[in-house]
Amino acid sequence: ASAVDCVRLIDPEARVDIRSSRLLVFDDKTTDGELAKIRHYYINAVESREKDLSVLSDMEQAEVKPVGALEGFREMADSELEPYCKTMGLAMNADDLREVVKYFRSEGRDPYETELRILDTYWSDHCRHTTFTTELEGITVEESFVKEEIEDSLALYLRIRRELGREHKSLCLMDIATIGARYLKQKGLLDDMEVSEENNACSVYIDVDVDGRTEKWLLQFKNETHNHPTEIEPFGGASTCLGGAIRDPLSGRSYVYQAMRVTGAGDIYQKVGDTLEGKLPQSVISKKAAAGYSSYGNQIGLATTHVREVYHDGYVAKRLEVGAVVGAVKAENVRREKPAPGDKIIMLGGRTGRDGIGGATGSSKEHNTKSLETCGSEVQKGNAPEERKLERLFRRPEVTRLIKKSNDFGAGGVSVAIGELADGLDIYLDRVKTKYSGLNSTELAISESQERMAVVVEAKDVETFMRYCLEENIEAVEVADVTDTARMRMFNKDRKVVDLSREFIDSAGARHYAEAKVGEVENRNPF
């Protein structure tokens, strides 16, 4: 993309496509067995493939499938739900799907496939945190030298729940994780925390000395894990871990100036031939992930002040890839307002492609030896210079003061990034700028292509905002209207492909239940 931009600086009308590849040449002494090992080391099927050098083609591998209604969906019996989830590759389970069937029976129609994919994304563990919101029906603490301390902590949690009047709420990991902040807020000890409808990053008010004057600023920080994408495509997974983390405070109007990277890997000295089936070698994951992270950070110009990789056999099952960032913005330059009917939503930044499709649901499912072959589109491709342009745009006070609400494009793409901005929305998918032709409605709705943002502005400010985007060489297009319908509707060339009630989307599917067990703690030194 950067090379194409350079050519267009010389000739703005140029229609060019620049690609790169790696050519390996072997002599006839190389055995088939050695070639197989080399293929496994060099070629990750998630992102690349062997090229027939006699053919030069830019045609896509994937066939474009038209999106239609799922005939007979609302007539499904309970016994058909579980097999249907597997056949369709859904992250939701049979209980969730049962709720979807009930909903469309009440609507008197079968869903479009796009609607089912959107619900699967919204209700995935990645988006609704199913694991953390699962109701715990019982908690057992096994015998160990810290059993008494753990039970005391559990008793303290239950006491605070009663004190806060939250006994009617589900007892779950999410409640345990957030109870401390709720308690401190009730006691008046979190007066410096910013509270708004936007949940892009943790945000606190601070006083900043600027040339001898005290100014009120917002300090924002966020961390992001990209364990799943980095496991299957290390370079792209790690680079977009940083890019995605940056966009969260950025959508909160902050300029990100500092980062931290903490990762976990297995034995990087293990022989390539001993790699588990369906896995990439640990040395490949570790090296390519480091290259991907540093590539993105260097191009966007971000200082990572702490880097640490931990090595443990437990990370063979799943890579740990954590990126954390800190940003800040002058408080008076930030506007937080509830979108109103008639407001417009502008999509700006990178174009939309098939990269990242299914990322939210993919990271919410179990994986097997075939994952590397079937998860090709789930990993996003980063373009740091494009995100740097977004950073420049959002540093301008005259720009941020036009924005009523903002969201970055992460898990779920258009359906979530725009879908979360207001209760009632009409979204026009055919207006979305694409990297190439042929994307259907589902792909346009759930693609997780990187470096994209959505902002809500008043109708009278659209032209002004567009002009500022043009000054920063950023593509921007008006893609949605805020309505008073309390429904999310999507259209593609005047054809309605999504019509879901906000209440049903926000229901997050069926309730989940589990028993929790705190296992025996053997090591007396937790470090």
Question: Positions of the model-derived regions?
Answer:
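Aromatic/hydrophobic pocket-lining residues that form π-stacking "cages" and hydrophobic walls in ligand
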Residues: Y293, I418, F465
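Anionic-ligand anchoring segments at beta-strand to alpha-helix junctions in alpha/beta enzyme folds, i.e.
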Residues: A417-T442
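Core nucleic-acid recognition elements
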Residues: A1-H367, E373-E386, L393-R401, G410, ...
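Short active-site oxyanion
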Residues: R452-M453
